């Protein structure tokens, strides 16, 4: 189980990313249309003034059950440990153990 403060930090980052999403998108669009170098530098400075954690890239995928960040299966939102346990208990529909 991940530390509670790490999970809370990720929640805070996702909220900030949602809050500043449209503002970041507008700055990116303006950067594409900007012609002069000084305009681009001004727009980049505007993006740097936003909080660092408001960038969606800084978020990390975590298991919704344990909060583990490594060994994460994107399709299920689970870490590999929980995925294995739940699949053995037949709690994940359509998941079967392979045999060949």
From Swiss-Prot:
It holds the Pfam family Ribosomal_S14. The keyword Protease does not apply. PROSITE patterns: RIBOSOMAL_S14. GO terms for molecular function: rRNA binding; structural constituent of ribosome. GO terms for biological process: translation. Belongs to the universal ribosomal protein uS14 family. Part of the 30S ribosomal subunit. This is Small ribosomal subunit protein uS14c. It comes from Pyropia yezoensis.
């Amino acid at each position: 189980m991940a530390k509670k403060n790490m999970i809370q930090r990720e929640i805070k980052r996702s909220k900030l990313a949602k809050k500043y999403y449209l503002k970041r998108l507008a700055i990116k669009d303006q950067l594409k249309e900007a012609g002069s170098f000084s305009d681009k530098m001004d727009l980049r400075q505007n993006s740097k003034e936003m909080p660092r954690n408001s960038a969606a890239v800084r978020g990390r995928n975590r298991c919704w059950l344990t909060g583990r960040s490594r060994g994460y299966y994107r399709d299920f939102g689970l870490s590999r440990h929980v995925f294995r346990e739940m699949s053995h208990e037949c709690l994940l529909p359509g998941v079967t153990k392979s045999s060949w």
